[in-house]
From Swiss-Prot:
Signal peptide bounds: none
GO-annotated molecular function: 3-dehydroquinate dehydratase activity
EC nos: 4.2.1.10
Top-rank EC class of the record's enzyme: lyase
Reaction(s) the record says it catalyses: 3-dehydroquinate = 3-dehydroshikimate + H2O
UniProt similarity note: Belongs to the type-I 3-dehydroquinase family.
Gene giving rise to this polypeptide: aroD
Cited CDD domains: DHQase_I
Biological function: Involved in the third step of the chorismate pathway, which leads to the biosynthesis of aromatic amino acids. Catalyzes the cis-dehydration of 3-dehydroquinate (DHQ) and introduces the first double bond of the aromatic ring to yield 3-dehydroshikimate.
GO terms under biological process: 3,4-dihydroxybenzoate biosynthetic process; amino acid biosynthetic process; aromatic amino acid family biosynthetic process; chorismate biosynthetic process
Oligomeric form and interacting partners: Homodimer.
Protein's name according to its UniProt entry: 3-dehydroquinate dehydratase
Pathway involvement of the protein, from the record: Metabolic intermediate biosynthesis; chorismate biosynthesis; chorismate from D-erythrose 4-phosphate and phosphoenolpyruvate: step 3/7
Entry keywords, A to Z: Amino-acid biosynthesis, Aromatic amino acid biosynthesis, Lyase, Schiff base
Organism name: Staphylococcus epidermidis (strain ATCC 35984 / DSM 28319 / BCRC 17069 / CCUG 31568 / BM 3577 / RP62A)
Length: 238
């Protein structure tokens, strides 16, 4: 059994509204990390990013910044080089704590090595992530994805996949559990949609260390409100 932190995903269109700030405050005890999604912005806006981070600094929570590309289920309509450039700019922003870096087998490993090392040199924790919104690959492929990602030595390995049957959920949980036993990286495994909700609430049973929830509208299929998620995760830790 591992301890599971709760990340609350927010995706503001502009600066944070008073309503959202109030909602974060009300639910602060259920949150360990604020995941700030910025791929919904028309273009990367460093000034706006700094303003939003400044707003979030009133809370004593870690800040994870994520730019999710459309290839992996987000709204960021950018090509590979544009995405890598955005990551490079984010790494030079010192105000937050964690950065999400998408992993893809199509990108040369040298590019990832450079980004991960630069981020870590700047004091950022790296969440190396891979998302498949179409299906759940076979168990061996899930394990191999974790294996290839861990070679980059990030702080977190995150794998999120879409299940089509109960066996898909079980395969994701097994891959997460097996990987957790053989790596020093923190593991995250998410089986999306309602079918896979057990992966969100029982992360710790299978070696997972981070579960993503929402404060307003879910930002991914199957996301649970953070207050409910915290309660459910805690049930397994008692």
């Amino acid at each position: 059994m591992t301890h599971v932190d709760i990340a609350a995903t927010i995706a503001p269109e502009d600066k944070l509204s008073k309503t959202l700030l109030k909602d974060i405050k009300v639910n602060e005890e259920s949150i360990d990390i604020i995941e700030l999604r910025i791929d919904q912005w028309p273009s990367f806006n460093k000034a706006l990013l700094n303003e939003v981070i400044k707003q979030l600094k009133i809370f004593h929570l870690k800040i994870l910044v994520t730019y999710r590309t459309s290839v992996q289920g987000g709204k960021g309509a950018v090509n590979e080089q544009e995405y890598l450039n955005i990551l490079g700019e984010l790494i030079e922003c010192p105000q937050f704590d964690m950065i999400d870096i998408e992993w893809s087998s199509a990108v040369k490993i040298e590019k990832y090595t450079h980004l991960v090392q630069r981020a870590q040199q700047k004091g950022l924790e790296v969440v190396l992530s891979h998302h498949n919104f179409q299906e759940t690959p076979a168990l061996d492929e899930l394990k191999f994805i974790y294996f290839k990602m861990q070679k980059l030595n990030p702080e977190y390995l995150k794998l999120a996949v879409m299940p089509k049957c109960q066996e898909d959920v079980l395969h994701l949980l097994e891959a997460m559990s097996l990987t957790a036993k053989h790596t020093t990286c923190r593991i995250v495994g998410i089986s999306m949609s309602s079918l896979g909700k057990v992966s969100r609430i029982a992360q710790g049973v299978f070696g997972g260390t981070l579960s993503y929830g929402c404060i307003e509208e879910p930002q991914a299929p199957g996301q649970i409100h953070v207050s409910k998620l915290k309660s459910m995760v805690s049930f397994y830790e008692d």
